[in-house]
Amino acid sequence: MPGEQTSASTDPSSPREPSDILTSDVLLRRFFETSAAGRRAAASLKRGAAVGVRFTDVPGDFRFYAQDGRPHFDMGKAGDPDFELTIAPGAVRAITSKPESDVGDLGITFFQHIVAKDPSEKIQVKLHAGLLKLTMHGWLGVLAAGGPKVIGWMAQKGLKGPSAVASALSRLKKG
């Protein structure tokens, strides 16, 4: 019928806007604020853990960090990031379209976009910290929270055993 609204995304009383009109930074911030998996992953992070974030479709610097076990994502440059991410819009959409996923599924999606060949889907990683600092900041706890799903995915990519993390880190440092 004319004037009748049939979807929640067009309903003016709906609390959510359609994701196709939101910028990557807003989508990612909302994801971290509402996703149980994002909160669970951030709970492993320690004081000082930080990620510098840039988007290929949004200008400016952003930072991700945890405070009191809760994820925070805001505009500004990370002071001493453990690593920096440059995230394409396709990767943002893939991650944020799964708010109900668990930490394992979220981790696999993240890693799939690190190895993606398509620039519109890619997450580029520039690692600044070594294994000791990453461990002290809780990043291995985040990996462990992904459990068998992430470990299985890594094994399929040839990263097996205790040296898998060190091998993956060395690949990221080389770029």
Regions found by a protein language model. Give the residues of each.
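Feature captures hydrophobic
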Residues: 2-175
